[in-house]
C-alpha cells in the first residue's frame, strides 16, 4: 500500500500546528483562524471533526466578521499574502481591545520581506507567541494525488497573450518544493522537452530545492532518492477530451459536482422528497473502492454486495430484487435500522444508476472516440468508415454541442491535422460558431497540428511498454491508455530516454533499490473488494523504496490519476500524480477558448 499523502498532510497539520498549541489559561482550548486558501489546504486532508477534537472551539475565516474572544489564544493558519497579513494586523490595531489573547502564526510558505516588515511594525507583533512557516502549499486531494489549486495555468503558461508567465512558473516551483519537503524528499528532477514550460519549471524547482538543502538544517531527506518528472499538457492534449467510463471520471464529467459535492433528491420512508448533499472523497470507503472501476462493474458490485449485506445481517425478509439499481434503492430505504451503512449504499446506488442511464446515448460515440484515440478498432485492425461515422454524429441534431466539439477535436488531433476545407465543412456540419472555433485554432498552442501537412513539433511520445490494448481489456470503450501511464512505466523500468526526458542535473549513477520491481499480474487476487466491509481489518504492507512523483502542468485528468494508482498497485511502489489543477472536459474546452481570441 502506498504511503497516503492525505494522511501525511493531516498528521503535519495536527502534529506540527494544532497539537503544539496548548494554552494553560484556557485549559488547552484555542481558536483557529484561516483564509480561503489555507482552509482549502486543511479541508483537502482533514475533517472539521479532526480539528475540533483537538480543543479548537471555533474555526473562522479571517475575512469574515468575527466575535472578539480576548481571553482565548488563536492559531492563525494563513497564506502569506498582503491581504491576509493586513487582516491579521487589523485584528490587533487597538491595543486595548485585541481580538484574541495571543497569536500563534503558522504560514503555508515563506513570508515575503515586505510583509515581514509590515507585521514587525504593527501592534500585532507584541501578541505573537509562535511563528512558523510550515511549507504546505498544495491540496492533498487523494492518497496519491495532489494539485496546486492554480486553475488558470493553461492561459498563463501557454497563451501568447500571457503577460508574465515567469511569475506563475516560480509559484508552481515553490509549491512543488513544499510537496517535496512534506514527503521528506530531495528528488532527482527530470522534465519533458515537449514544451519549454516544463524545462523552466523544472529549473526553478531545482533552484528552490537546492536553497532549502542549503538553508534549512532540519531538513533531512530520505537517502533513497525519489524522482520528480515534470510534464505538461502538450504531452497528451487528447486525454481531457475522451469519455472515460470509470466511476469517478464519468460522474465528474456528466454531473454538476462542485467541490466534490454531489447533490440529489432522495425519497424518505414516508414518501417525502429531500435534497441531500454528499461529499465524494476518501473518507467514504465505498467511493475509494469503486472510483476506478468501470461503471458496469460498479453497478454489478453494488447490487451483489447489497445482497450479501442483507443475507449477512439476516434481513432477507425484505425480499430479493432482480439486480437493478432502482430496486436496490427501494430495498435500502426499507431498512431504517441500518441507516449508516444503508446511507452509503443509497448514495452510490443513486449515483451509479444515474451514470449508467447515460451510457446508452454515449456508447456509439465512445466506440468512435476509442478508434480515433488508439488508431485501431476493438480487434486491433485499422478502424473502418471513420469519416462517415464522424459525419453522422456531427450532423445529429440531438447530440450535445460539447460532445461534437470534443469529438471533432479528437479527430483533428488523431489525424495529425486535416485539410482546411474539410475542417470548415465539419465545423459547419456540427453547427460550431465562429467564436467556438477559437478553441480549435488554439489547440496549436498545445502543440497540435491543425492542417494536414503543416510543419510543427510533434509531442514527444515514450516507448510503448505494452502491446495493443485491443482485445485485451474487459470493455471496448476503455482501450485508450493515457500517455502519462506509458511515461511513468518507462521510468519505473528505467527505459525512459534521457534525450527526450532529460535530467536537470547530471544523470545519476544507477543505484540499487531495496524495492524490487514486481512482475505480478495486474489482475487482483482477492475476489471480495476491500470496500465491502469497513470493519474488516486488512493487513497491508507499506511500499518501500524510492518514490515517483509525476507532475502535469496545465491540468490532469481522472483517467491519468487512475492510471497512476494502477501502476502503483502493480509495481508495489509509491507513485504520486499531481498537477496545477483537475481538468474536466468542459473546463478544458472553455480554457482553450480563452488562450487567444482571433
Curated annotation (Swiss-Prot):
One of its GO terms (cellular component) is plasma membrane. One of its GO terms (molecular function) is syntaxin binding. It comes from the Eukaryota. Keywords: Protein transport, Transport. The keyword Zinc-finger does not apply. Disruption phenotype: Defects in locomotion. The keyword Phosphoprotein does not apply. Pfam families: Sec1. One of its GO terms (biological process) is vesicle-mediated transport. Belongs to the STXBP/unc-18/SEC1 family. PANTHER family: VESICLE PROTEIN SORTING-ASSOCIATED. Involved in the vesicle trafficking. Binds syntaxins. This is Protein transport protein sec1. It comes from Dictyostelium discoideum (Social amoeba). The lineage of its organism: Eukaryota, Amoebozoa, Evosea, Eumycetozoa, Dictyostelia. The gene is sec1.
Amino acid at each position: 500500500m502506498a504511503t497516503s499523502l492525505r494522511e501525511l498532510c493531516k498528521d503535519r497539520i495536527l502534529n506540527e500546528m494544532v497539537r503544539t498549541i496548548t494554552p494553560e489559561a484556557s485549559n488547552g482550548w484555542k481558536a483557529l483562524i484561516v483564509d480561503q486558501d489555507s482552509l482549502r489546504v486543511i479541508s483537502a486532508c482533514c475533517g472539521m471533526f479532526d480539528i475540533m477534537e483537538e480543543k479548537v472551539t471555533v474555526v473562522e475565516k479571517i475575512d469574515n466578521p468575527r466575535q472578539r474572544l480576548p481571553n482565548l489564544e488563536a492559531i492563525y493558519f494563513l497564506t502569506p499574502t498582503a491581504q491576509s497579513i493586513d487582516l491579521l494586523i487589523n485584528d490587533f490595531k487597538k491595543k486595548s481591545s485585541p481580538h484574541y489573547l495571543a497569536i500563534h502564526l503558522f504560514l503555508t510558505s515563506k513570508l515575503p520581506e515586505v510583509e515581514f516588515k509590515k507585521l514587525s511594525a504593527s501592534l500585532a507583533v507584541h501578541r505573537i507567541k509562535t511563528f512558523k512557516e510550515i511549507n504546505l502549499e498544495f491540496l492533498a486531494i487523494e492518497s496519491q494525488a495532489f494539485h496546486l489549486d492554480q486553475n488558470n495555468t493553461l492561459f498563463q503558461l501557454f497563451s501568447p497573450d500571457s503577460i508574465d508567465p515567469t511569475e506563475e512558473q516560480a509559484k508552481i516551483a515553490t509549491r512543488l518544493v513544499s510537496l517535496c519537503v512534506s514527503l521528506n524528499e530531495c528528488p532527482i528532477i527530470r522534465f519533458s522537452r515537449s514544451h519549454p514550460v516544463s524545462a523552466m519549471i523544472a529549473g526553478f524547482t531545482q533552484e528552490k530545492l537546492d536553497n532549502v538543502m542549503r538553508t534549512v538544517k532540519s531538513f533531512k531527506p530520505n537517502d533513497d532518492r525519489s524522482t520528480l518528472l515534470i510534464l505538461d499538457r502538450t504531452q497528451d492534449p487528447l486525454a481531457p477530451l475522451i469519455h472515460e467510463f470509470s466511476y469517478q471520471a464519468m460522474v465528474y464529467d456528466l454531473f454538476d459536482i462542485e467541490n466534490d459535492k454531489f447533490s440529489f433528491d432522495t425519497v424518505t420512508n414516508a414518501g417525502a422528497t429531500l435534497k441531500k448533499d454528499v461529499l465524494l472523497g476518501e473518507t467514504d470507503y465505498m467511493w475509494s473502492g469503486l472510483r476506478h472501476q468501470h461503471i458496469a462493474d460498479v453497478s454489478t458490485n453494488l447490487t451483489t454486495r447489497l445482497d450479501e449485506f442483507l443475507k449477512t445481517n439476516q434481513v432477507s425478509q425484505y425480499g430479493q430484487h432482480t439486480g437493478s439499481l432502482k430496486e436496490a434503492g427501494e430495498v435500502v430505504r426499507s431498512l431504517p435500522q441500518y441507516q449508516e451503512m444503508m446511507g452509503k449504499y443509497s448514495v452510490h446506488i443513486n449515483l451509479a444508476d444515474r451514470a449508467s442511464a447515460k451510457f446508452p446515448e454515449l456508447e456509439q460515440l465512445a466506440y468512435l472516440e476509442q478508434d480515433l484515440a488508439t488508431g485501431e478498432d476493438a480487434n486491433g485492425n485499422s478502424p473502418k468508415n471513420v469519416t462517415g461515422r464522424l459525419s453522422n454524429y456531427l450532423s445529429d441534431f440531438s447530440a450535445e454541442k460539447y460532445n461534437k466539439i470534443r469529438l471533432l477535436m479528437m479527430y483533428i488531433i488523431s489525424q495529425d491535422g486535416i485539410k482546411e476545407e474539410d475542417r470548415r465543412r465539419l465545423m459547419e456540419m456540427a453547427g460550431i460558431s465562429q467564436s467556438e472555433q477559437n478553441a480549435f485554432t488554439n489547440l496549436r498552442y498545445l502543440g497540435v497540428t491543425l492542417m494536414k501537412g503543416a510543419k510543427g513539433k510533434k509531442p514527444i511520445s515514450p516507448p510503448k511498454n505494452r502491446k495493443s490494448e485491443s482485445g485485451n481489456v474487459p470493455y471496448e470503450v476503455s482501450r485508450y491508455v493515457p500517455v502519462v501511464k506509458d511515461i511513468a512505466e518507462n521510468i519505473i523500468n528505467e527505459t525512459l530516454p534521457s534525450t527526450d526526458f532529460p535530467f536537470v542535473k547530471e544523470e545519476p549513477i544507477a543505484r540499487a533499490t531495496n524495492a524490487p520491481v514486481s512482475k505480478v499480474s495486474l489482475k487482483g487476487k482477492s475476489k471480495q473488494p476491500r470496500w465491502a466491509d469497513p470493519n474488516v481489518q486488512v493487513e497491508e504492507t507499506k511500499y518501500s523504496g524510492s518514490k515517483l512523483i509525476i507532475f502535469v502542468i496545465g491540468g490532469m485528468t481522472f483517467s491519468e490519476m487512475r492510471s497512476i494508482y494502477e501502476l502503483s498497485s502493480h509495481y508495489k511502489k509509491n507513485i504520486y500524480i499531481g498537477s496545477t489543477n483537475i481538468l474536466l472536459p468542459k473546463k478544458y474546452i472553455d480554457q482553450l477558448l480563452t488562450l487567444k481570441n482571433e
